[in-house]
């Protein structure tokens, strides 16, 4: 189960709330902050190396043999890679080709649209124009996945309840 969408749309908040609702699931936190801890530049400053590190993170998550709830997935990598100036064309081709091979590994996509302004936490981008472009790209990619996806809206608990209804 992959939680996807632009930054600052409530994914991590809902991810944390889902932990006590899905006790038999493994929870995998988002990758961007993880690779940033290794010193890779992130957000608009991301590079080919950043994106390949994030690719490794997402592919490793798919190797886990249990039910997963993911705060971001390979789709996020594809979307954000399309908006980076510092990424080589061959790396973007690799990411897109890999996406086409792994996208069916996800059983459920949960899409978080933009409903409120970005929160400046010192890590995520607060560039609203960039964020809106990212959101539109998510919508395009979601239309290309085989599985139907759920769009969640409202308060965090309303979103959790929508997910519970969708997953049962």
List the predicted regions and their residue ranges.
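Conserved substrate/cofactor phosphate-moiety recognition/catalytic segment
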Residues: 19-60
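Glycine-rich phosphate-binding loop used to anchor ATP phosphates in small-molecule kinases
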Residues: 52-103
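A glycine- and Lys/Arg-enriched "phosphate-lid" helix/loop adjacent to the NTP-binding pocket
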Residues: 85-158
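Hydrophobic positions on the alpha1 helix immediately C-terminal to the Walker A/P-loop
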Residues: 14
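Hydrophobic anchor at the beta1->P-loop junction of P-loop NTPases
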Residues: 3
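Conserved lysine of the Walker
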Residues: 11
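P-loop (Walker A) phosphate-binding loop of NTP-binding proteins
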Residues: 6
